[in-house]
Amino acid sequence: TFDRELRLDRLGFNVLRWKLTGRGTPAQSPLTLQGFIRSSPEQDRPDLQFQASHVSYAAKPWFPLWRKGAGHEISAGTLLLNPASRGRVSLASADPHALPRILLNFLAEEPDRRALREAIRITRRIFNSEPARPFIARELAPGKQAEGDEALDAWLRATVISAAHPTSTCAMGTDGNAVVDAQLRVRGIEGLRVADCSVMPRIIRGNTNAPAMMIGEKAADLVLGRTAST
């Protein structure tokens, strides 16, 4: 696994090699496997993004007598696409320097919990099948003792984190709650547009990098007065 390459002497060599040649371990993706899957046959499109990595998520640089390595561990995680649970960002006060109130509201809706429980079970089936089975000694987390819905929900609530693709906090729309209009203009403020994924009414079922670029391109056209025909 990749943990071997995190030993400080090897890590330093690998970083230098990458800097000089553009090759080596740092040039590789940390994800060995990635795929879009459905949590149930009722889903008409994938609602989960499965990822596997050839290193422990908890791995850190190590060296004998300083810090012990993570060992020969692999990790798998699943992103919930287009979750039903919705968070909220609101102002704490009229002071523009005050930090906003942020409510992530993860796992508030049962469909989200159900999909992620199934994601754990799908992951177990993947690693208990050939050809992975001979290389797996045991499951470290959530552990074989976590079987029922209640146990899996408890583990999910303790470990779930953001996939760093936040959207929709300045959603476009025509209703009173919409922050921007169809031209990306902030309602009630002259000369201000928003040009990022916060204008999406809902998150897409995938990564947000490409949509963010397209929103930026569209915003540039709107500012310059360009239309599709020109």
Task: Please give the residue ranges for each predicted region.
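C-terminal structured subdomain/cap of oxidoreductase catalytic cores
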Residues: 1-3, 37-40, 73-132, 153-230
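A general boundary/transition motif marking the beginning of the first structured unit of a protein
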Residues: 23, 111, 143-144
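Short, glycine/acidic-rich hinge or "gate" loops at secondary-structure transitions
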Residues: 133-144, 230
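Mid-to-C-terminal "cap/lid" subdomains and adjacent gly/pro-rich loops that border
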Residues: 1-69, 125-131, 154, 158, ...
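Mobile, glycine/GP-rich and aromatic-enriched active-site lid/loop segments adjacent to catalytic centers
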Residues: 51, 119, 136-139
